[in-house]
């Protein structure tokens, strides 16, 4: 197996474009026939993905794996932090949750985490021809430098070259790049191979004097300037994207609970031309919806209390009274049930609380998470069976207390099991499946059930592929990658 130099992409800030840049590089290398894998030593994210072997990684790394045309693997994101309280996060190591830690607890744990990070990087290096690495936040965070595993701490330990990307759309790009480099140690500065400027709009000739100044002052080349790409529809790692009200469309409202998880579930709705998806925040009402969906949550008890404090439970009651449909996904499904018990104190003090009482299920939280990819059939009332795909990430086990319809049959290696519940009035549907809208047939079935006439799904896979190829094409035209991989790319004018 031929080997190519690994490369780490670090950023001057969060949301500088690291995730997209790594995805684009993975696709460019894959298009050249190179077996490439993405890697992020440490990630903090609201959204996670399930691997085939039942592990949990950041959804951004799953997206990057798709860009590389390889299957997601737990070693692509060995340390994942999922915030579940204001001061704490669940720590997931090589795909498995170990415990919840506060900031100081994790700070102390990082020195123990580095061996896992290096083990995962070694696995990818041995099994792929190239590894493209994504940093986290900024390498110049002075307060986070001790025992760093996410940025230069990892780069030094693994001895990998680095490029630094900055978002010019935010302003202050030269200060960001110059200042970030200046705050690094001499050995760290030496492994920086160049800069990338992201999201540029306008005439690049006006930028050239600044680029020349930056190269002269730092002695580092600018590898290129990537233009702002409009309408780039990729999963958001953390930020919730909402659109403005568009009259005449089918209105879907999602209450934003404090610990919302996997809001990427709603991307197929957000992108559909006939749907107006609205994320409803604190102090806002769910009234006026055609369809209400309770999202997943990383702290179901606390978020159920929050739903009641916002009087969204009253909005749901009124919505149902006037013939509306309601759906719950994962934690939202649990909230719709009769009871939620936490005897082990998974989410806080041990307790048992009443749910919203719309579905005849009772849920008990358990220490072991259910982490699995799912494929099966969805049968909604008065509809034919359709294909459904998704993934499960939950600690709760729900028991049906009545004879309500279970609409999803899941095929496993050993047997068949069932997921979800629909009430006898056919107005409420709950499921544990994240990604339930991604399969076009399931999308159409659920939205037809909810009341959208002549529903025709969009293909999320095609949309993602188009976006990744756009990114790769733009980067190939904009960057001089011969400075990193001279055996793969021809010299290109950087600007």
UniProtKB/Swiss-Prot annotation:
Keywords assigned: Cobalamin biosynthesis, Glutamine amidotransferase
Q: Which GO terms describe its biological process?
A: cobalamin biosynthetic process
Pathway recorded for this protein: Cofactor biosynthesis; adenosylcobalamin biosynthesis
Q: Which domain of life is it from?
A: Bacteria
Active-site residues per Swiss-Prot or TrEMBL entry: 330, 434
Annotated ranges, domain GATase cobBQ-type: 249-442
Role, per record: Catalyzes amidations at positions B, D, E, and G on adenosylcobyrinic A,C-diamide. NH(2) groups are provided by glutamine, and one molecule of ATP is hydrogenolyzed for each amidation.
The family note in this entry says: Belongs to the CobB/CobQ family. CobQ subfamily.
Q: Which PANTHER family match?
A: COBYRIC ACID SYNTHASE, DETHIOBIOTIN SYNTHETASE
**What name does this protein carry?**
Cobyric acid synthase
Organism name: Aliivibrio fischeri (strain MJ11)
Per the UniProt record, the lineage of the source organism begins with: Bacteria, Pseudomonadati, Pseudomonadota, Gammaproteobacteria, Vibrionales
């Amino acid at each position: 197996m031929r080997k190519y130099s690994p490369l780490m992409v670090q950023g001057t800030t969060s949301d500088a474009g690291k995730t997209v840049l790594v995805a684009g590089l993975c696709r460019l290398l894959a298009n050249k026939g190179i077996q490439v894998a993405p890697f992020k030593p440490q990630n903090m994210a609201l959204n996670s993905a399930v691997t085939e072997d039942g592990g949990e990684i950041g959804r951004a790394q799953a997206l990057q794996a798709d860009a590389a045309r390889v299957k997601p693997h737990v070693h692509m994101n060995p340390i994942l932090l999922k915030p579940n309280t204001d001061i704490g996060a669940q720590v997931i190591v090589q795909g498995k949750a170990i415990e919840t830690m506060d900031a100081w607890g994790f700070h102390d744990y990082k020195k123990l985490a580095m061996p896992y990070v290096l083990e995962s990087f070694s696995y990818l290096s041995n099994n792929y021809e190239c590894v493209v690495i994504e940093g986290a936040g900024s390498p110049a965070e002075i307060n986070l430098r001790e025992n760093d595993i996410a940025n230069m701490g990892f780069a030094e330990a693994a001895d990998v070259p680095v490029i630094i990307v900055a978002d010019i759309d935010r302003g202050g790009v030269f200060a960001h790049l110059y200042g970030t480099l200046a705050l690094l140690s001499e050995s760290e500065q030496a492994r920086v191979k160049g800069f990338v400027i992201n999201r540029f709009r306008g005439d690049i000739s006006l930028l050239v004097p600044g680029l020349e100044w930056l190269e002269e002052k730092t002695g580092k080349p600018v590898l290129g300037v990537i233009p702002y790409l409009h309408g780039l529809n990729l999963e958001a790692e953390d930020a919730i994207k909402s659109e403005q009200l568009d009259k005449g469309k089918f209105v879907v409202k999602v209450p934003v609970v404090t610990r919302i998880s996997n809001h990427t579930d709603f991307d197929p709705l957000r992108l559909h031309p006939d749907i107006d998806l609205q994320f409803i925040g604190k102090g806002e009402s769910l009234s006026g919806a055609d369809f209400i969906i309770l999202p997943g949550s990383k702290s179901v008890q606390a978020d159920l209390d929050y739903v009641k404090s916002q009087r969204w439970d009253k909005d749901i009651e009124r919505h149902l009274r006037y013939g509306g449909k309601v759906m719950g996904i994962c934690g939202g499904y649990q909230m719709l049930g009769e009871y939620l018990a936490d005897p082990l104190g998974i989410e806080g003090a041990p307790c048992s609380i009443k749910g919203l009482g719309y579905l005849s299920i009772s849920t008990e939280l358990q220490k072991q998470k259910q982490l699995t990819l799912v494929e099966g059939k969805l049968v909604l009332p008065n509809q034919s069976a359709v294909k459904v795909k998704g993934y499960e990430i939950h600690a709760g086990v729900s028991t049906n207390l009545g004879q309500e319809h279970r609409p999803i049959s899941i095929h496993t290696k050993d047997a068949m099991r069932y997921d979800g519940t629909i009430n006898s009035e056919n107005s409420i549907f709950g499921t544990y499946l994240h990604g339930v809208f991604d399969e076009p047939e399931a999308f159409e079935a659920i939205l037809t059930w909810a009341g959208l006439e002549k529903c025709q799904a969009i293909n999320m896979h095609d949309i993602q592929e188009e976006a990744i190829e756009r990114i790769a094409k733009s980067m190939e035209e904009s960057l001089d990658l011969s400075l990193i991989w001279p055996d793969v790319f021809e010299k290109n004018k950087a600007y």
